[in-house]
Amino acid sequence: MSRALIKFIRLSPTKARLIAREVQGMNAELALASLKFMPNKGAKFIANAISSAVANGGFEANEVIVSSCRVDAGAVLKRFRPRARGSASRIRKPTSHILVEVSKAEVSAEKTTKAKKASVKKES
């Protein structure tokens, strides 16, 4: 298992989590292909984290799955916008930390035995 962490992304964590949920559990190659065509800003950052995690482990993208994709809230940048009559309102610019873990795609023993039993039933 290998991981990659990208910190202080200028993107709201709630928006990034929508994309992170989509790719969790997918094959890394399939996840990168689907992220490439997503119009969201966070898709580029999550794709970067996935490819970095794959490279950190020394794997190929087609032999690993995205086992975990977590988005945490980072520091919030606070800015002020001038308003009427000398007042000001606060602008919050949230940041995110993206953690991606990839692991080898292994077929479990249960799945193979179920597949064998199903093929035996079809033959008889």
Swiss-Prot record:
- Where does the signal sequence lie? none
Instruction: Give UniProt keywords alphabetically.
Output: Ribonucleoprotein, Ribosomal protein, RNA-binding, rRNA-binding
Q: Which GO terms describe its biological process?
A: translation
Q: Name one GO molecular function term.
A: structural constituent of ribosome
Annotated Pfam families: Ribosomal_L22
Domain of life from the UniProt record: Bacteria
Q: Does Heme appear among the keywords? A: no
Q: Which GO terms describe its cellular component?
A: cytosolic large ribosomal subunit
What family does this belong to?
Belongs to the universal ribosomal protein uL22 family.
Q: Per its record, how is this protein called by name?
A: Large ribosomal subunit protein uL22
Instruction: Note the subunit structure.
Output: Part of the 50S ribosomal subunit.
Q: What does this protein do?
A: This protein binds specifically to 23S rRNA; its binding is stimulated by other ribosomal proteins, e.g. L4, L17, and L20. It is important during the early stages of 50S assembly. It makes multiple contacts with different domains of the 23S rRNA in the assembled 50S subunit and ribosome.
The record ties this protein, via HAMAP family, to:
Ribosomal_uL22_B
Against PROSITE patterns, the record matches this protein to:
RIBOSOMAL_L22
